[in-house]
């Protein structure tokens, strides 16, 4: 089932998400719906807060980026209760976009490597060291479960320059190919 994407300005995107337990209701169905919604909206990642749930669940498929970023080849994950344990010292700046911030792309500086622990959809524990763009994708999605957005990492001047676009998103004056929930009313369209 396709789920609507919550847009910038909706309060759920600013909540720090909670860990869940293996008995979370209809978890497999939720993961399948999140994955379907991610693909339908041409995303490479989706976090549960982006569909209105303040829980620590991420779905990622960065494989479509493999031509430009070989480290993304086959990089498909479901990450539950993810926690970044360590961030590398080396930084890299790349453009990022977000389904919750349609039509906005800005340069964001992030560590080039991270160490993350999480459980998969079967609640099997994992710890991985990720590099390059795969690390960037995970950090971007991870921000969502910590109540952050990629625009929180841009300069105040850049944020001022996109203020009009951000206001339009809040007001729902944005076109997308996917269903959205706008702020502050939460009205679906």
Swiss-Prot record:
Record-linked InterPro entries: Peptide_deformylase (IPR023635), Peptide_deformylase_sf (IPR036821)
Positions that bind Fe cation: 98, 140, 144
UniProt cofactor note: Binds 1 Fe(2+) ion.
Cofactor: Fe(2+)
Pfam families: Pep_deformylase (PF01327)
Residues annotated as the enzyme's active site: 141
EC number annotated for this UniProt entry: 3.5.1.88
GO-annotated molecular function: metal ion binding; peptide deformylase activity
Alphabetical GO biological process terms: co-translational protein modification; translation
Keywords (A to Z) from UniProt: Hydrolase, Iron, Metal-binding, Protein biosynthesis
Record-linked SUPFAM superfamilies: Peptide deformylase
CDD domains: Pep_deformylase (cd00487)
Catalytic activity: N-terminal N-formyl-L-methionyl-[peptide] + H2O = N-terminal L-methionyl-[peptide] + formate
Transmembrane segments: none
Family per record: Belongs to the polypeptide deformylase family.
NCBIfam families recorded: pept_deformyl, PRK00150.1-3
Stated role: Removes the formyl group from the N-terminal Met of newly synthesized proteins. Requires at least a dipeptide for an efficient rate of reaction. N-terminal L-methionine is a prerequisite for activity but the enzyme has broad specificity at other positions.
Protein name: Peptide deformylase
UniProt source species: Porphyromonas gingivalis (strain ATCC BAA-308 / W83)
